[in-house]
């Protein structure tokens, strides 16, 4: 039987709205109970948004659990803008640490959400400054020195991966804080010698401006040096967008966010996404008739053995 694209799109919208959205909402409740989260956002084009042109930029936000969580949760949320109020609304009920990049919107969140900066972004700024120099001038340049400081932190962090959060906290103060102190002292000295609008000047400005957030990871051994975990989770959506390019309607963008969320959460927990979604859709209609908490029972954490990826 040949099915039109419109028919298949309508099926996805209906399935998302009737069954998958409830599972998403149950995951959302669990996510907001975690002590440490990661956030990121990327642009998405939605053609038929009320009151906006078809070329307007909309956003897909991402929120996910950290490495200290027992069960991984990865949630996407479509919103028409990048306003901080969207993150605040999504994270209502959450109190804890939030890994994010340098976007100022995160810094306007309520005080019970403590933002942790991303050293991968800081290092990237120095890498960009290094890239503006001729090859023969890169070695021992200020940009190379700044990049070296950042890379030293990542190298030290690798050796702490298997420690408990308590042990990691102590080791960071012992090993990484001296590097941070030296880096800040160097950056403050370099600022006076560097053109503010140069690539190096921008890297130093980013470092100084973000310093209170970049050093937050020292306060809790559960925290991570970077927000790479969120960036990796955003990548499947970004790569998918290169194929489908845009969403037609806000409803379609919302359905995409729900479906991507369940697929990526399933993958993060070692489940086969197809088998997991099949299990959800086979059980949701019947369970929903008899059990008010049916969506909880269909979370990835409760999936049967046959939903898991085969061991290699």
Task: Label every PLM stretch briefly.
Residues 1-312:
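Catalytic center-proximal scaffold of phosphoryl-transfer enzymes
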